[in-house]
Design a protein with these regions (language model features):
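Sec-dependent signal peptide recognition
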Residues: 1-9
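Extended soluble regions of mature proteins
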Residues: 14-236
């Protein structure tokens, strides 16, 4: 009888679905303003309830499952700890912002763009994935914006979506929303590259480029989402 019970339990355990694979992303961003170009390389690991972001000497580990974020300086071997809302708990409603216009916001003014988006018909391979291009133009008072972005179909069996991560360096919230809405209309496609050009009426053109170099669904190395034991918490 015991043998039958053990065999039944083992058969059930073997039939349990394995967790979806982690997602590993490496991408490069470029910010061009006048004659200056600033290039940054970013690495992300994304798993269930946790992620890691690495940018040069800076390391951030987000543990939604534990309700904490660790931010570290690899060179100094120190880190800070910030509490966040754990997974599954309601997020507090943010306060309603006051009225903001271009005079009060100044450099951070975000115009309200009217977007026209279309598929260009162009295709390319980015990080080993076949991609298609979309182009968009945005008109607003005192500003114009032109955006091109490349998208691929999701990797089979992968539930993590890299789009938020890849779009993070883009400067305009309106551009990001336009990209998110467009990809949602095309089967939840993933963003792998984008170029954003903003032309304010009273400032030089600003260009932001982002492009994925590595995209793979693999299991993260052991300890990826843990703070290295040799690191010390700042202020202690």
């Amino acid at each position: 009888m015991i043998v039958h019970v053990l065999l039944a339990w083992l058969a059930g355990a073997l039939s349990w679905p394995s967790p979806p694979p982690d997602l590993h992303i490496v991408f490069r961003s470029e910010f061009v303003y006048q004659a200056s170009t600033r290039t940054t390389s970013n690495e992300w690991w994304v798993s269930e309830g946790k992620s890691l972001a690495r940018q040069g000497d800076r390391l951030s580990i987000y543990r939604e499952d534990l309700g904490v974020v660790w931010r570290a300086s690899v060179k100094a071997g120190t880190y800070t700890e910030t509490k966040i809302q754990p997974t599954g708990q309601p997020v507090p409603t943010p306060p309603v912002p006051g009225k903001v216009d271009m005079h009060t916001a100044g450099y951070y003014w975000e115009p309200s763009y009217d977007w026209a988006v279309k598929a260009s018909g162009q295709s390319s391979t980015i990080a080993g994935r076949p991609c298609r291009e979309f182009v968009a133009t945005g008109d607003a008072d005192y500003a114009e914006s032109r955006v091109s972005f490349w998208a691929c179909d999701p990797l089979p069996g992968v539930t993590r979506n890299p789009t938020d991560t890849v779009a993070a360096p883009l400067r305009s919230a309106s551009v990001k929303k336009m990209i998110f809405d467009t990809l949602a209309k095309h089967g939840g496609a993933w963003l792998l590259a984008a170029e954003e050009q903003q032309e304010p009426a009273i400032a030089p053109t600003m260009v932001m480029r982002v492009r994925v170099e590595t995209l793979e669904a693999v299991t993260a190395p052991p300890g990826t989402f843990e703070m290295p034991p040799t690191f010390k918490q700042a202020g202690r």
